[in-house]
Regions:
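Class II aminoacyl-tRNA synthetase catalytic cores and aaRS-like
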Residues: 1-273
């Protein structure tokens, strides 16, 4: 966006160090990442809404939508009313053809880290605060809300994104608040802060989890049912036998040394006499 592209999307293969669960594969996912310049949160959400209305109409004609337009629910209201930030708004949860989409908006910008006694970003450090809440970064960070948005379908979070910060002064304030010192921030993000100082278009976007999106659309309950060659719970691919051990020769060719884990005396089992 800083480089002058007004709109772009990509199909991104994402690798993360995360534990698997019903709606998340072991360490990997496929996303449709959408980014727009000269945009607003409303424009991003309107784009996603129109895209999914067309998707359901053209690809899943047997299904129907609970509400149009899709509800936009503040984060605090979702927790108070549904006790979750991923509410399932279907009127009949036994109907496999009902699709209830909603957006969760107005998220807290920060959350308090009790262990380290500092503020952490609720989403990421580049998420823009609501314009009227910029002043709260200095005075009352816990009350500041952001331009973050999540997209939920039948109780599954299928997308998330935000509008980004474009003011270098605001960005440096947030760096400092979350424990990134000014010198460190300028060293790590100098290219970005310098670009911001020349002016950058307001921009933002959303990333749609392609695999996760298919779970409710196809009437499944687990991600393994909608992806090819799903891995086991401990990350093994039974189809190709991966991961596997490298031979000593391959390790030498690659310059890799395997360091065996030392067993502490506490973990050693002692036989009873």
């Amino acid at each position: 966006m800083v480089g002058g592209l007004e709109r772009y999307y990509q199909l991104a293969r994402v690798f993360r160090d995360e534990d698997p669960r019903a709606d998340r594969a072991y360490g990997e996912a496929t996303q449709i990442d959408i980014e727009l310049s000269f945009t607003s949160q409303d424009e991003v959400l309107n784009l996603v809404e129109s895209m999914f209305i067309a998707l359901v109409r053209d690809v899943f004609p047997e299904k129907y939508l609970t509400k149009i337009p899709f509800p936009r629910i503040p984060y605090a209201e979702a927790l108070k009313k549904y006790q979750t930030e991923k509410p399932d708004l279907r009127q009949n949860k036994d109907d496999p053809n009902e699709l209830a989409f909603c957006f969760i908006v107005d998220w807290p910008l920060f959350e308090w880290n009790k262990e380290e006694r500092r503020w952490d970003p609720n989403h990421h450090i580049f998420t823009a605060p609501k314009p009227e809440h910029v002043r709260l970064i200095d005075t009352d960070p816990g009350r500041a809300h952001s331009l973050q948005h999540d997209f939920v379908l039948n109780g599954f979070e299928i997308a998330g994104g935000s509008i980004r910060i474009t003011d270098p002064a605001v960005q440096e304030k947030i760096f400092e608040l979350v424990g990134i010192k000014k010198e460190e921030g300028r060293h790590k993000f100098q290219h970005m802060l310098e670009a911001f100082s020349f002016g950058v278009p307001p921009h933002g976007g959303i990333a749609i989890g392609l695999d996760r999106m298919l779970i409710p659309l196809l009437g499944e309950t687990n991600l393994r049912e909608v992806i090819a060659f799903p891995k086991t719970g401990d990350g093994r691919d039974l189809m190709v036998g991966a991961p596997s051990s490298l031979s000593e020769q391959k390790l030498r060719e690659l310059g890799i040394e395997v360091i065996k884990e030392k067993t502490s005396p506490k973990n050693k089992q002692t036989k009873k006499r």
